[in-house]
Amino acid sequence: MSRKLSHLIATRKSKTIVVTVLLIYSLLTFHLSNKRLLSQFYPSKDDFKQTLLPTTSHSQDINLKKQITVNKKKNQLHNLRDQLSFAFPYDSQAPIPQRVWQTWKVGADDKNFPSSFRTYQKTWSGSYSPDYQYSLISDDSIIPFLENLYAPVPIVIQAFKLMPGNILKADFLRYLLLFARGGIYSDMDTMLLKPIDSWPSQNKSWLNNIIDLNKPIPYKNSKPSLLSSDEISHQPGLVIGIEADPDRDDWSEWYARRIQFCQWTIQAKPGHPILRELILNITATTLASVQNPGVPVSEMIDPRFEEDYNVNYRHKRRHDETYKHSELKNNKNVDGSDIMNWTGPGIFSDIIFEYMNNVLRYNSDILLINPNLNKNDEEGSESATTPAKDVDNDTLSKSTRKFYKKISESLQSSNSMPWEFFSFLKEPVIVDDVMVLPITSFSPDVGQMGAQSSDDKMAFVKHMFSGSWKEDADKNAGHK
């Protein structure tokens, strides 16, 4: 009897061992198979050193609006543009998510949270946006949040960690949040003046009205028959405002760009290609401009355009022979010009114009609507295809129609979007699925450049300008 029992126990043990081994084998096989499957699309942390970083300044051979994300030959996405497009695909027909993002050093419940900001914060998290999910990201939660959000593209996280300064990181973070999740980002020192649902981007009747009352503006490649009524009626995918429109001869002494887009408040759908290009540019710039990037940058960038990646060659400094272009950046030598052209409104504006020029060049169905070209303010309306007539000089000098000839020539001869298209805006403008709001919308009460008061119908957000990042950065770098 004892022999039979011993044999039975041994048999059961053997079966248990066999089953356990088979189970472990199955789990390992599944894990390895799953890992191989994921590696076809997402590079691991060990692989991201091989990621190629295309320059955004030379994208003449690609249609940025219709980016294809599958490399059929290698079945792997080695290009950061491809990786971003695949990880965060863009759905132009989806609504803008009802989310509001803000960031600060500490959470709102922390005793060190500025008391003045509580009033501003309540406008974003209160009755003006009751149906919106509000998120305040504090400094100590940024890295864990990004590591989860951008796990498919770890090189982006690497670049974020390498940034020499919190101002650069704050700029980069807003683009990363909107690209991955969408919604509205607004600086902590901003106040929401009107309910979000009253914004032109949220108002379907306004969108329908602007389409009905304004003919699409032609450009060289345009084919009106290709414009789909369904596409036209969709909510914009990116909503931005004018920050600066200095119509003066000495504008370059005060501003980085003649038309500068505001980035303290941005509304977007996740995956928008402009944000993708911005993230690509900032990631590549960071890795190429800082000390000890931890990756073989020279093997990742396009050797034909090395200067595109170095922040020291941006804007005015490109032709400054006295500037040390080879000097790598650290937290002691980053100044206001670096921030402006690395993550700030300078590069933000450049990327937007580059994208618009690209889509006009490669697509024949881009919707261009500019009510500011169709009317002469109080003088009534005219067609955008004919020059302004019988308008006094003072009125014309403060109207977009002042630049009618330049705008028409740029669009119809070279598929080029001129900055003049966005000057003196009183009404929102549409370029494909990008809506550009007048300076009054996010900069009321500034008392210049045509900005109106907070009571104006087009005033939606007020910036309190509590920060002085450029002055602080210049002092940090030893500038006066």
UniProtKB/Swiss-Prot annotation:
It catalyses: Transfers an alpha-D-mannosyl residue from GDP-mannose into lipid-linked oligosaccharide, forming an alpha-(1->6)-D-mannosyl-D-mannose linkage. A motif (DXD motif) lies at residues 187-189. The keyword Transmembrane applies. Induction: Expression is regulated by SKN7, SLN1, and CDC4. Changing residue 187 to A: Loss of mannosyltransferase activity. Its EC number is 2.4.1.232. Residues 1-15 are cytoplasmic. Keywords: Endoplasmic reticulum, Glycoprotein, Glycosyltransferase, Golgi apparatus, Membrane, Signal-anchor, Transferase, Transmembrane, Transmembrane helix. Residues 31-480 are lumenal. It comes from the Eukaryota. It is a single-pass type II membrane protein. Optimum pH is 7.5. Disruption phenotype: Stops growing at the early stage of bud formation and rapidly loses viability at the non-permissive temperature. Exhibits a defect in the initiation of the mannose outer chain. Leads to accumulation of free forms of oligosaccharides (fOSs). Glycosylated. Belongs to the glycosyltransferase 32 family. Mannosyltransferase involved in outer chain elongation of asparagine-linked oligosaccharides of the type Man(9)GlcNAc(2). Adds the first alpha-1,6-mannose to the Man(8)GlcNAc(2) and Man(9)GlcNAc(2), but not Man(5)GlcNAc(2), endoplasmic reticulum intermediates. Represents the first enzymatic event required for synthesis of outer chain mannose linkages on yeast secretory proteins. Also has the potential to transfer a second alpha-1,6-mannose to the Man(8)GlcNAc(2) core oligosaccharide. Present with 9490 molecules/cell in log phase SD medium. This is Initiation-specific alpha-1,6-mannosyltransferase.
